[in-house]
A protein has these predicted regions:
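Catalytic domains of carbohydrate-active enzymes that cleave complex glycans
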Residues: 1-114
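Glycine-centered flexibility motif
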Residues: 40-44, 116-118, 138, 162
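Hydrophobic beta-strand core residues of beta-sandwich domains
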Residues: 100, 138-140, 155
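Extracellular Ig-like/FN3 beta-sandwich strand-entry sites
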Residues: 105, 143, 157-161
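Exposed beta-strand and adjacent loop surfaces of beta-rich binding modules
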Residues: 107, 119-123, 161
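A short beta-strand micro-motif common to beta-rich folds, especially ectodomain repeats
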Residues: 110, 148, 156-168
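Surface-exposed binding patches on compact interaction domains or structured appendages
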Residues: 115-147
Length: 168
């Protein structure tokens, strides 16, 4: 998530970078405990197999912190929008959700996120009454996720399209 979010310019990429580094420290401490303390060191080296830092098929020489990317936040709150299953980001313009069908009856998400510092308000509007949205308005400091589904009882048979607008 860190690298994807960094490519998208999300400020939350920095949270994931910190978390990766924290968990690497925890893993190192757990390995040391297992090797030196547990059962008086009886199992030393049993948990020392290299398991962090793989970037290709061959085994690295030692564990290493996975590469993380940090984002420099923009100086003002800036909205970014990304839909489930797509790396593309749009501050405005068109993005498409996956196709809905009444057999799976699943929902898809849209992330509204900040690329800068501060907060911004957003509103969600739909052009069709059968579009079911989990959140119609909100305030974003880092990110907010909305879920989009279909109320199949309000929809006529056949293929149809609807438009969802996200604006500040």
């Amino acid at each position: 998530k860190n690298r994807l979010y960094a490519r998208q310019g999300r400020v939350t990429a920095n949270d994931y970078a910190r978390r990766v580094e924290e968990l690497y420290t925890v893993d190192t401490a757990m390995t040391a405990y297992y090797n030196k303390v547990l059962a008086g060191g009886k199992w030393e080296k049993m948990m020392s197999d290299i398991h962090l830092g793989y970037t290709k098929w061959s085994m690295p020489k030692r564990d290493s912190v996975p590469q993380v990317v940090r984002v420099e936040p923009l100086s003002k709150p800036t909205m970014g929008v990304a839909v489930e299953g797509c790396e593309t980001v749009s501050p405005e313009g068109e993005l498409e959700l996956p196709v809905f069908d009444n057999f799976e009856n699943r929902k898809y998400y849209i992330d509204i996120f900040n690329r800068g510092t501060g907060t911004f308000d957003f509103k969600v509007k739909t052009d069709e009454p059968w579009m079911d949205v989990s959140l119609r308005k909100g305030k974003v400091e880092t990110e907010s996720r909305i879920w989009v589904g279909i109320d199949w009882t309000k929809l006529k048979a056949g293929e149809t399209e609807g438009i969802l607008y996200i604006c500040r």
